[in-house]
Amino acid sequence: MQFTHLVALALALATSEAAHQGFNYGNTKSDGSAKSQADFQAEFSTAKNLVGTSGFTSARLYTMIQGGTANTPISAIPAAITEQTSLLLGLWASGGNFANEIAALKAAIAQYGDDLAKLVVGISVGSEDLYRNSVDGVKANAGIGTNPDEIVSYINEVRSTIAGTKLSGAPIGHVDTWTAWVNGSNSAVIDACDWLGFDGYPYFQNTMANSISDAKALFDESVAKTQAVAKGKEVWITETGWPVSGKTENLAVANLANAKTYWDEVGCPLFGKTNTWWYILQDADPVTPNPSFGIVGSTLSTTPLFDLSCSASSSSSAAAAASSTAGPSASSVIGGKASGFTTAAANSAKPTFTVGKGPGGSYNGTGFWNSTSSARPSSSAISGSSSGSAAGSSGAGASGASGQSSSSTGSSSAPSTSNILSNAASGLSGSIFGAVVAVCLALAAL
């Protein structure tokens, strides 16, 4: 095999293994006004060029519908096409408007075709609907939810809708709080999904020790709980973050220093390893919510409020991050390998407090779980589960490639060049570094 062919194959393998890192984006601003294509495009461009990062080039959407319309496709799609930002599409599944979500999905496929298809990472049917439908969600006044049977029905409807279209290869999942995922009554939704979306916010876990020093452990443990029930399916981090300002939740203090610590300890190990959409790029335009999670302020800028660079000691190298945020391609999106947590954890995990944002921010409910499975309203003096924010804004996220390890067959015969290359690239999580190492190993075997 020629050297140029080896390099091309290595880079192709790295691209196909690369995960996605980006932010969550609602269809309105924080005052409820609808975002335009220009608004989305400005956000996507800013995310790609954030100082201290290799760029956040993926967007998670909550709805297919443009703000202020019945079922017109969201203008984030043409903005993403212009900016080459990959998309985790979302269909809002609570409140009885799903037919319009399907209509918008069909219209988007017809209007944008291949240009859309090459950007789609996956499709999320709903966001925290199961939590809002739970006893805890009802107690917390979290908003209208949906039962698991209906979510399964909606997932099947989306599968039928995209069958035979440009999006036929898109993996379909559902996003919810980890407490919803570990609830056995929701297991049918897990069965229906190709992947599980995890929302988790230790900041809101105000019935437990939730200082910034506890945050990483709380986050990791709640992810492990979700992994344990995922039945081998990938778990994508669809929402997490720490506020830069706002009220204190028990021991959790909202400030820039703690937001930076959470980014370093939780975000950096995810970036370049697991599909992750951070909350949030900007939530203070034009009104600053309490709490505010935006990593940029009220004025959109590529200069963040705190340092976003990840140190070399983090598990994600700059090279891996560069690979994970390269422009999307057909191989790395539809038909490519997704990247997420797949290893089920046997250890018990502490619960994590989680938050969801509805399309356009009309909902900002927050769910939590504790040993007594009780929920308390945050608007009261007692620590609670509802963030109570009416601000509308979209979230943010980051992503990375999933790690895979190749196993030895025990054969004494020399492995083939193609096997060395494939296994090396896979075992090194699809990073550019992994691709380079794979090439070197392949050349050594010649």
From Swiss-Prot:
SUPFAM superfamilies according to UniProt: (Trans)glycosidases
Alphabetic keyword roster: Carbohydrate metabolism, Cell membrane, Cell wall, Cell wall biogenesis/degradation, Glycoprotein, GPI-anchor, Hydrolase, Lipoprotein, Membrane, Polysaccharide degradation, Secreted, Signal
Keyword Cell wall biogenesis/degradation: yes
One Gene Ontology term, aspect cellular component: plasma membrane
Active site (record annotation): E128 (proton donor), E239 (nucleophile)
Keyword Signal in annotation: yes
Region feature (Disordered): 393-416
Disulphide bridges: none
Enzyme class: hydrolase
First-listed, main subcellular location of the protein, grouped into a coarse class: membrane
Biased composition (Low complexity): 401-416
Propeptide position ranges: 424-446
Location in or out of the cell: Cell membrane; Secreted, Cell wall
GO biological process, one term: polysaccharide catabolic process
PTM (free text): The GPI-anchor is attached to the protein in the endoplasmic reticulum and serves to target the protein to the cell surface. There, the glucosamine-inositol phospholipid moiety is cleaved off and the GPI-modified mannoprotein is covalently attached via its lipidless GPI glycan remnant to the 1,6-beta-glucan of the outer cell wall layer.
Lipidation (GPI-anchor amidated asparagine): N423
Signal peptide from the UniProt entry: 1-18
InterPro entries, per database record: Beta-glucan_modifiers, Glyco_hydro_17, Glycoside_hydrolase_SF
Domain of life: Eukaryota
EC number(s) given by UniProt: 3.2.1.39
Protein topology in the membrane: Lipid-anchor; GPI-anchor
Family statement drawn from the similarity comment of this UniProt entry: Belongs to the glycosyl hydrolase 17 family.
Function: Glucanases play a role in cell expansion during growth, in cell-cell fusion during mating, and in spore release during sporulation. This enzyme may be involved in beta-glucan degradation and also function biosynthetically as a transglycosylase.
UniProt name for this protein: Probable glucan endo-1,3-beta-glucosidase eglC
